A protein has these predicted regions:
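N-terminal leader/capping segments at the start of a protein or of a new domain
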Residues: 1-29
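Catalytic strand-loop segment that frames the active site of acyl-thioester-processing enzymes
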Residues: 23-54
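General beta-strand recognition
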Residues: 36-38, 101, 115
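Hydrophobic beta-strand-centered segment that forms part of the acyl-chain substrate-binding groove
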Residues: 68-101, 133
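HotDog/MaoC-like acyl-thioester-processing domains
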Residues: 1-6, 95-96, 105-159
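Hydrophobic alpha-helical segments of small multi-pass membrane proteins
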Residues: 57, 65, 86-92, 118-121, ...
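Compact, glycine-rich, soluble single-domain proteins
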Residues: 50-64, 68, 83
Length: 159
């Protein structure tokens, strides 16, 4: 269960609606504190029609979003975050024409640094085709940032 379910859902919705994620048509399941971020296979996401491989940037985006959402599940209040480091190891090629999913897990948190593992899979979560490792920094908002955020959220809710 996320530390703050309302905050988590707000951040989850924000992340999957970033313009780049909308273009990729990323979607997700936020029913747990380790959400699954997904994208359906599309030919336009291939690095090359000759290889048939999904572009590495698509996988990188999925890993980054899944990791950020998993970190957001730990927050009691809004915090600023940034990806400091990310590594993806490919174990095999994903199967064409099947959705790609990523789930992440925060395995260690030291002060403002969080270490997150993720796995990329298709039909069977126990058979990942790639593994990710991410390091994030996070910090509480200043009072001015909190006030600006509250004003923004009120505007968004009024729409």
């Amino acid at each position: 269960m996320p530390a703050n379910p309302v905050l988590f859902q707000t951040l989850f919705n924000h992340y999957i609606n970033i313009p780049h994620c909308r273009w990729l048509k990323i979607y997700g399941d936020s029913s747990s504190d380790e959400p699954i971020i997904s994208v359906d296979w599309r030919d336009e996401l291939l690095e090359s029609p000759k290889t048939g491989n999904i572009h590495g940037g698509v996988i990188t985006t999925l890993v980054d979003m899944a990791s950020a959402c998993t970190l957001a599940a730990l927050f009691q209040q809004f915090e600023t975050t940034a990806t400091l480091d990310m590594r993806i190891d490919y174990l095999m090629q994903p199967v064409p024409d099947q959705p790609i999913h990523v789930r992440a897990h925060c395995y260690r948190q030291e002060g403002s640094i969080a270490f997150i593992r993720s796995h990329c899979f298709q039909n069977d979560e126990t058979r990942p085709f790639a593994l990710g490792m991410s390091t994030f920094i996070h910090n509480p908002l200043t009072q001015a940032e909190q006030q600006a955020l509250q004003a923004y959220l009120q505007q968004e809710q009024a729409k």
